[in-house]
């Protein structure tokens, strides 16, 4: 938006939160954005906020452009390249991870249920994230096939 003020981190953050609150109807009062990349332990958002955002985008004019940026399962050069290989045509999602954190959010296009926005946020564990990625994949398969 153009409000004739010089751009800076705070005004940019305020604009993003204002857009999310007014357009996507997301309660941003408990949301914390610490950096623009999303790769910070200080970023805090909920699965509800993310799925609300995904639902809003799906109903918006940005739907096709946004979905085209998400990797599909088993697709080369994507974060799901080694995951959900046989479900590649049914899932478009983005991963996110840090030590002790494994997240997966996006859309499932189920032949049975149609499109479903989802967000699986798993954190607070020690050791390998593989069991959590396996659980996420099992949940996605259940959403696809019922």
Sequence positions of predicted segments:
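A small/polar active-site loop signature that marks catalytic segments
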Residues: 1-64
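Loop/turn elements at helix/coil->beta-strand transitions in domains of secreted/extracellular proteins
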Residues: 28-29, 114-117
